[in-house]
């Protein structure tokens, strides 16, 4: 698929008929690792949840009901970044953004993940409304990692309609 077609056709899917198989998940996460990062520090981390028991616990305990329903049938990938690494030198922030750079790099990683999934024929839903501390305990995520999102990955049950985009002149200023 051409890249322009890929970015224009990718949708957030809220209903899944099948999870991504393990080997495809490994390939997907390997592709997501190719995302650029500050000084190549690669502070993004993934927790791929595949077992039925872990998926059920994560959905019921870590997600609100609307996200539980939206992600049923999919594999879940929790994405985090290592705090105080990206955008820091000798423990001090390089500028006012500080840990925002870790979140920025993770955003790049997650964009690569969802676009690579689409290229592989899978659909995704990035969920930011979640209970981070419950997820931390369930998946044994270290305290030095900031939990950002839970991403559902699988085959869509039905095709969602395209969502409108704001006009370019509303979000861009040419100088």
Tell where the protein language model's regions lie, with residue ranges.
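C-terminal helix-cap and adjacent tail motif
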Residues: 3-12, 17, 90, 149-175
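A short beta-loop-alpha structural element at the N-terminal edge
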Residues: 17-23
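Short beta->alpha linker loops
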Residues: 20, 50-53, 130
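A structural motif
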Residues: 25-33
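Small-aliphatic-rich amphipathic alpha-helix that forms the alpha element of a beta-alpha
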Residues: 32-33, 77, 94-138
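Glycine/small-residue-rich phosphate/adenosyl-binding loop
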Residues: 37-106
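A glycine-rich helix N-cap at a beta->alpha junction
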Residues: 67-76, 140-162
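Short secondary-structure boundary segments
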Residues: 81, 129, 155
């Amino acid at each position: 698929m051409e890249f322009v077609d890929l970015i224009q056709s990718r949708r957030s899917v809220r209903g899944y008929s099948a999870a991504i198989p393990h080997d495809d998940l490994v390939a997907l996460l390997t592709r997501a690792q190719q995302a650029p990062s500050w000084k190549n520090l690669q502070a993004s981390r993934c927790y791929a949840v595949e077992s039925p028991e872990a998926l059920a616990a994560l959905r019921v305990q870590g997600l609100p009901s609307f996200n539980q329903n939206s992600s049923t049938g999919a594999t879940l990938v929790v994405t985090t970044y290592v705090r105080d690494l990206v955008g820091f030198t000798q423990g001090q922030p390089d500028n006012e953004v500080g840990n925002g750079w870790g979140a920025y790099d993770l955003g790049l990683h997650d964009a690569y993940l969802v676009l690579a999934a689409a290229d592989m024929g899978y659909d995704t839903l990035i969920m930011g409304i979640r209970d981070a501390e419950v997820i931390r305990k369930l998946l044994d995520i270290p305290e030095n990692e900031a939990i950002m999102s839970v991403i559902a990955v699988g085959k869509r049950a039905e095709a969602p309609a395209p969502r409108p985009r704001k006009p370019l002149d509303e979000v861009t200023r040419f100088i």
